[in-house]
Each structure stands twice: as structure tokens, then as C-alpha cells.
Amino acid sequence: MDSTGRNLVYFSSVSENTHRFVQKLGIPAIRIPLHGRIEVDHPYVLLLPTYGGGRATPDLNAGGYVPKQVIAFLNNEHNRSLIRGVIAAGNNNFGAEFAYAGNVVSRKCGVPYLYRFELMGTQDDVDAVRAGLAEFWKEQTCHQPSLQSL
């Protein structure tokens, strides 16, 4: 991982939609595997797809929105302690549940929901996420106390 802390961790299913989006970003990223587990050592923003959808009303406690691999990753206390924000992909066909995995992770992990996009995203989405992440990490760095100020 990048020692500057400007890291992205993502999950992509076999559809590879999220993976293709991350490739277009052109920034350092670690993929949560379909099988097996990983542990991270630096703060990160999580990018994930939304599963499920089509319920009459969204329910944060209903389950099924967040991929099981991401749940396992975040159930590792060390990994969960390093999450700083979330970005979610979804399908507009899900209506109010569009990119709803971001709502779930944001609430349960107490981190900001930074952005959402549809399926593989557009070039505008890629540009917005790239610029937004750069600004987000810049702000994170500005809010960390230095050893000299302690």
C-alpha cells in the first residue's frame, strides 16, 4: 500500500464492474478477494458494489446490500479501524436502494459516504472520484496532529 495513506480498498464481483471503474481511476488500490481474506495496514476509503435491491423501502438492518466478502473484511477489527470513507456503486433500477451499500457501511462504521455511481461509472464519475479522493486525503492530512504540535 501507498505509504502516504491515500489508499483505496475495493470489492468487485465476477461481473468486474467495480474493478473496471477502479482501473480507470489509475490510483493505488487493494482488492478484497472473492475467496480468502486480507488485512490492511493503512487508512483507506472503501469502494464497493451494492447487492440486492428492489425492496419496497430501504432498511439498513435488512441485510443483503453489502457483499459477504466486504462484511468479513470489515468484521476484522483492525481493518474496520482504518476505514475513513466509503464510495458505492449501484443500479438506478433499485430506486431508493441505489448504491445503498454505501449507506449501510457509512452508518455502521461511522464514516462519510463520499460518492455513489451507477454500474461501471461514467468518465464524469471517474473524474469526480479521483478529484474527490485527492481532496479528501488532503483534508485528512491537515486534520492529523503532528508530533511537533503535541
From Swiss-Prot:
PANTHER family: PROTEIN NRDI (PTHR37297:SF1). This is Protein NrdI. It comes from the Bacteria. GO terms for biological process: protein modification process. GO terms for molecular function: FMN binding. The gene is nrdI. Probably involved in ribonucleotide reductase function. It comes from Mycolicibacterium paratuberculosis (strain ATCC BAA-968 / K-10). Belongs to the NrdI family. It holds the Pfam family Flavodoxin_NdrI.
